[in-house]
Amino acid sequence: MGSKNSASVALFFTLNILFFALVSSTEKCPDPYKPKPKPTPKPTPTPYPSAGKCPRDALKLGVCADVLNLVHNVVIGSPPTLPCCSLLEGLVNLEAAVCLCTAIKANILGKNLNLPIALSLVLNNCGKQVPNGFECT
């Protein structure tokens, strides 16, 4: 009876080990590594420079003095003054403002002018606007 008893105990332990191995092998596998996406940096807004660079030769902007001389004779609906506006053509408002600001500050236009008013007059005559926040100092 001893061998029958030991055989059944051995069978019991063998089956226990087998079932334990089967049950523990069905554990859920961990998820594969997924790298976190890098956050995109927010672009820094560029402030309006009061002293930027003019893509045109500021000396050529002397022809814009005619616009300031003739501004009191301007008729509404008349075409813009050609020599000055053709120099500013193709420039965005900020570039045109920087160019004229440089010319006015360097006294290229030949007069002591009120900066904001002169700048606004020439730009408006050529169909451009002074950018918000732009200061010609």
Swiss-Prot record:
It is found in: Membrane. Coiled coil: none annotated. Residues 1-25 form the signal peptide. Residues 30-53 are annotated as: Disordered. It is a single-pass membrane protein. CDD domains: HPS_like. The chain crosses the membrane at residues 88-104. GO terms for cellular component: membrane. InterPro entries: Bifun_inhib/LTP/seed_sf (IPR036312), Bifunc_inhib/LTP/seed_store (IPR016140), Hydrophob_seed_dom (IPR027923), Plant_LTP/defense-related (IPR051636). Residues 38-48 have a biased composition (Pro residues). Induction: By the removal of auxins. Keywords: Membrane, Signal, Transmembrane, Transmembrane helix. May be connected with the initiation of embryogenesis or with the metabolic changes produced by the removal of auxins. This is 14 kDa proline-rich protein DC2.15. The lineage of its organism: Eukaryota, Viridiplantae, Streptophyta, Embryophyta, Tracheophyta.
